[in-house]
Each structure stands twice: as C-alpha cells, then as structure tokens.
Amino acid sequence: SDDDGTVVLTTSGPIRGKRLQVGSAAVTAF
C-alpha cells in the first residue's frame, strides 16, 4: 500500500507524513 501522505492520528493531533510500521506501533516520518 502507498503510505505517502497518510494522516496519522496521535495524542498531539493529526500529523501528515509517511507512516512507518515499527514493531506493533506506527510512527510518522517526514
């Protein structure tokens, strides 16, 4: 799947970036 431009919801609010799957958690890289 293409994760570029994915909007990731975090405790700080929605963040746009590339979603990377790390372990069982998803982080956002720019």
Swiss-Prot record:
Keyword flag Glycoprotein: yes
**GO CC terms for this protein?**
extracellular region
- Location(s) in or outside the cell: Secreted
Q: What keywords does the record list, in alphabetical order?
A: Glycoprotein, Secreted
What is the superkingdom listed in this entry's lineage? Answer: Eukaryota
Post-translational modification, briefly? Glycosylated.
Q: Does the keyword Secreted apply?
A: yes
Principal localization reads secreted
Free-text function comment from the UniProt entry: Rathke gland secretions may function as pheromones, as predator repellents, or contribute to the maintenance of the turtle shell.
From the Swiss-Prot or TrEMBL record, give the protein name.
Rathke gland glycoprotein
Q: Which organism is it from?
A: Lepidochelys kempii (Kemp's ridley sea turtle)
